[in-house]
Amino acid sequence: MKKLAGFALLVILFASTLPAQKAETTIPLRFDQYYTLDQVYEALRALHKAYPQLTTLETVGTSEEGRPLMAMTVNNPKTGPALDKPGMYVDGNMHGNEIQGGDISLYLLDYLLGNYGKNPEVTGLVDRLCFYVVPVVNVDGRHHFLSDPNTPDSNRSLRIPTDDDRDGLADEDAPEDLDADGNICAMRKKDPFGRYRTDPEEPRLMVPVKPGEKGEWSLLGDEGVDNDGDGQVNEDGEGYVDPNRNWGFDWAPPYVQGGSGEYPFSGVGLKGLAEWAMAKTNIAFVWSYHNNGGMILRGPSRKGLGEYPQQDVAVYDYLGKQGERIIPGYRYMISWKDLYTTYGDSGEWATQTLGAYFYCAEVFAPESEAFKGVSERPEPGTRGEEAVRDIFSSEVSERERLKFSDSVVQGELYKPWKAFKHPVYGDIEIGGWVKMSSRLGPPFMIKDLVHRNAMAVLFTAKHLPEVAFEVLEVKALGGDLFRVRTRLSNPRAVPTMSYLAQKANLYPKDMLKVSGAKVVAGGVLVDPFLDRVSFKKDRPELQFLVVPGFGKIEHEFIVEGKGGLTLRYESRHGGKIAKTVKLD
């Protein structure tokens, strides 16, 4: 296997001569480079080897080109089976070019495992919860993006051959690295009737001509030639099936939304991942890492789905606004309202199928490359400040980004224009933004990005349900009758079942079961001071409920009998707890 270039993943085991002493393990993941797919695989295997008691590593699907989708589960079996605990799911690299999510996922795993037993907060989370992490969803895409020449925006698709130009051939005319520099840059040609002229303030850039101005350049698109002789250049590249438009909830065909594929889950790796996730019934929250905009997005993904229940919105608002504080510059937003409409995306699938809460993080913030001094920056809260933070705004101008490239990374992000003889266009120039630019921060910025995003996950994880079960009272009423009162409480923000899942009846509510004696009556204790109880008519020994976030629910049972009485609480997202009391 290819060794881990750059960080050289090492597993150093110091075996003590004392047989009772445990070995210590060090895995120095440095996070000062973007790791190739093979390096991600090797890191996962090394983490599993170093922490076998806390991790499970499995292949959950296979890509179109035969590469495994690997998932790591972090769970302490000494504190209970994984499925009996609230589950946090994290994935990254849904689109092939959006590689930061893979590195965030690795950092999260390394942080959880490396700090277990050292940091009380981390130890408590690993003992209480279960973490499911899929660092790379689009494994073919990550491999080809880092290994092959690309633009910053290319190689997003699943590797499903698609005939984009309807000529009977698939993927036959993709961009090409004409000057063999490892990048797919832009082509331009001198043209007095062109739509662009040289930027008078920065000759490496171009600006659109205004009415009445003479043109100087025509942009010809990305590097490439007419491979199939149809008179078009680069008209049929890889795919295009968008892995975040191919999920099975609210999917729409390509004439509604490009890139959706011929049918839901036509991506074989996605289908395998979805089937695996469906079996993880304890997944209560999902973070999915994408890469452009500096945003924490929640659904709905389109207006027609309607707003989420207000109780769920309150959960999203509380956690999302804290996320803005953990990751300065990020904005908490609603997908359809603040960005754009999507169909068949993974977030709505997780929300409406798994019944989980969901955030999509767009991790690269364009303002991080805004080359401005303090006095040049817009005042916080002004329209100018908002524009700088808007990925669709030109306020973070190409001029600023070029100055950032020149001054902060010594010109690595932009290729100067160079002459080239094109077989069709003749004398042209090739240049512009390189592959590892525009939506990928330079390597020195990686550590801060992955740490802050992982900490946002951990803050959310702290607010997964933490249910406490108390027997408040066992009171003899005379004869063999007893009154038993219980309380289920949750000091965290996330309830044991989302209100959307309740509304859609996605799965059974939590259950409180009483056994060991005859339950004469039972129900929700509405007011313990006035003895008001909402009794359940049928089968009072079985109560269906949801424990709210930052709240409680109390029950009262009238039971008949002597001896032991067992009360069992069971929840998909709240865990399992049993209590036994004596009736005497």
Indicate where each model-derived feature is located:
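Acidic carboxylate motifs that coordinate Ca2+ or other divalent cations, activating on Asp/Glu
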Residues: 163-167, 181, 226-230
